[in-house]
């Protein structure tokens, strides 16, 4: 069931899941034990300014955005069910998809013209083509623009809430009935120890996320709530810096199977 959830998301990971560079395979291997957890099973992470235990995992959770939903790779529910941690997993995307321009549908244009988002993008030399009908993001230097747009879409989804869908009824219940705090973070596999030539791209996206989403997250949320015309009454917290799988393993040394640790050099 966990495999099905991962491979049927909008990212079409079924075509890549058997690859070592699948960004969906690693979180599946790391968090699948919490999909149908045994009593007492939990994983510990430092998020939201404190150390928290998470006891349940959902994969490829779908939240409302515009047209198509956003699919967040993993949603972890805390032991007291009051917090949901949304994780967007990144493996090699920041090496493969750096561009100076990305184009998206016109439905996003009004949101991205809001001052908080404009300031966030401008902080890293990203601008919007104000004359174009569609949303066009431009950068002075090649950057992983899709990662930033994806994070903003995920934040829209956190504000708007889950897409009504029978196959994610347990996640919908956790979001609607119990959760008081929603935390958004991205989690990286730090590959700089093995992909030395890509170390600059890794560091660039690490700082890009921190500078745009981390530093301006609250202002971005204000813009989203104003644009969407709603606030879900929940506290939304944005991690300022990316998490890493390496740190997760350090904090939970007995969690992963030894074969997975060896496979990924964790």
Question: Where are the regions that the model predicts?
Answer:
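Interdomain/boundary linker segments immediately adjacent to catalytic/signaling cores
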Residues: 1-38
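A short acidic/basic microdomain associated with nuclease active sites
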Residues: 38-67
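Short, solvent-exposed loop/turn segments at secondary-structure junctions
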Residues: 58-66, 90-94, 189-193
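Short acidic loop-to-beta-strand element that houses the catalytic metal-binding Asp/Glu
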Residues: 69-77
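A short, conserved, highly charged catalytic patch centered on acidic carboxylates
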Residues: 74, 90-101
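Active-site beta-strand-loop-beta-strand hairpin of nuclease catalytic cores
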Residues: 76-86
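Acidic, metal/cofactor-coordinating or nucleic-acid-engaging core segments within structured domains
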Residues: 96-184
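Non-catalytic C-terminal interaction segments of nucleic acid-processing enzymes
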Residues: 156-266
């Amino acid at each position: 069931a966990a495999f099905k959830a991962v491979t049927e998301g909008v990212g079409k990971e079924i075509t890549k899941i058997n690859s070592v560079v699948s960004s969906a395979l690693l979180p599946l291997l790391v968090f699948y034990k919490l999909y149908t957890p045994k009593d007492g099973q939990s994983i510990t992470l430092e998020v939201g300014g404190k150390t928290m235990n998470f006891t349940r995992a959902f994969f490829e959770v779908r939240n409302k955005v515009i047209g198509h939903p956003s699919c967040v790779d993993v949603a972890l529910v805390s032991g007291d069910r009051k917090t949901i941690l949304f994780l967007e997993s990144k493996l090699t995307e920041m090496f493969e998809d750096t561009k100076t321009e990305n184009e998206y549908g016109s439905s996003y244009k009004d949101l991205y013209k809001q001052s908080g988002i404009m300031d966030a993008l401008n902080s890293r030399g990203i601008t919007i083509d104000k004359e174009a009908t569609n949303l066009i993001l431009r950068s002075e230097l090649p950057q992983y623009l899709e990662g930033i747009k994806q994070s903003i879409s995920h934040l829209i989804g956190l504000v708007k809430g889950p897409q009504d869908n029978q196959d994610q009824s347990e996640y919908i219940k956790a979001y609607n009935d119990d959760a008081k705090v929603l935390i958004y973070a991205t989690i990286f596999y730090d590959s700089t120890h093995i992909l030395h030539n890509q170390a600059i791209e890794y560091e660039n996206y690490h700082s890009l996320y921190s500078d745009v989403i981390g530093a301006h997250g609250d202002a971005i949320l204000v813009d989203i709530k104003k644009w969407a015309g709603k606030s879900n009454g929940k506290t939304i917290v944005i991690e300022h810096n990316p998490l890493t799988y390496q740190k997760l393993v350090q904090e939970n040394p007995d969690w992963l199977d030894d074969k997975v640790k060896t496979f990924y050099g964790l």
